[in-house]
Amino acid sequence: MPVISIWRGCVLMASCGITFCSMGQIDPFSRELIQVGYNLALQGHPPLSGYAFYYLNKPNFFNTNLTLRLAVAPTYMDSELGISHALSEYTDLGIGLAGGGFADNYAEIRQGRYLQGESFTGYGGEVSLSIYHLFNPASKIPLNGVIRGIAHYSTYSRDDRTAPDFALAKDHGTFSVRTGLRWGGREPTLFPSLAMELSAWYEGSFRTENETYGFGDRKLEPQSHLLWGAALLAYTLPEWKHSFYLSLTAGTSVEADRFSTYRLGALLPMVAEYPLSLPGYYYQEISAKDFGLLGLNYIIPLDEKQRWNFNGTLTTAVVSYLPGLEQPGNSHTGVGVTSNRVSGANSVSTSR
């Protein structure tokens, strides 16, 4: 495999899980983790996909009202400084900085085929400002509101297999706003023992460029709008110590393009705050403008201290495709088998 292709795959492993750092409120607990995950395709030739990063959450960072959240991969870094009670007793502020190499790579996958001639390398950096508000401080189940503004800049370059006549998307800035309500929530761990959540979100993205690219057949939309909701329930049976994790995520979009649409596929549970997992498929294989995704995980401990666990995953999705990236049928189902260790996960997924 040529050198640039190797680097693209290796850095995807490093960077695609960094959105783990983007949470809905300031985490009050001290955490220091190493997360490793890899998605192996048993057939075909997809782009390598996975993540490897060091995660730190440090309350009382130089001051009692400061919390540092940091995720570091070999070529990418994502961080946020949380300031508790910055605007009021129950309103916090977060200042974020992220960036590095290969973070904005784009892999074209159409009809289940990875098209390297239409794929390219991307680099990016961003700053963000977030406001977190707790609406019901006296309640056992918190209701949090989030408003986040993001300024992101992306640059693109060819790799060794990009087609010579394929025009790259122009370097551009993207200004985004995300807002949402979350009732409940989950700890930022692989599979929490107890959790519940109901949440609703909106994200609008506004770009500085809206030119065509590729073979003149695709376009950067000047603005895109995403709306989605999520529900989850996690519980551990007290006698058996078996756990289940049930989740439902659904979303729609307006004027989405290849860079802003929902992309489903693979089994990488720490790849995002709301991972669109579909085991047995390539990472981000399915591009959907609308979707519904139902997932069930059942976790069985393999030793008394629960350092090793067996995890079975079943997910099913109904999608409406982004134009130009359609696949046969509008429903997809995947089954996955994973062995998990406290410090990471090695996973093998069955074919669809």
What are these regions (language model features)?
Residues T67-L68, G112-E118, R161-L168, N210-L220, ...:
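Extracellular loop and loop/strand-boundary signature of outer-membrane beta-barrel proteins
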Residues G94-A138, S349-S351:
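Outer-membrane beta-barrel translocator/channel fold
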Residues I26-S30, V36, T174-L314, L322:
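C-terminal outer-membrane beta-barrel translocator/porin domains of Gram-negative envelope proteins
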Residues V36-L40, L66-V72, L93-Q111, G145-Y153, ...:
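Transmembrane beta-barrel strands of outer-membrane/channel proteins
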Residues P2, S22-G99, A103-Y106, G173-S193, ...:
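Outer-membrane beta-barrel initiation region
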Residues R8-T19:
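Bacterial N-terminal signal peptides
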Residues S130-V177, R182-T189, S193-A195:
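Intrinsically disordered, low-complexity linker/loop segments enriched in Gly/Pro
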Residues L42-G44, N60, Y76-D78, T91, ...:
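Gram-negative outer-membrane beta-barrel proteins
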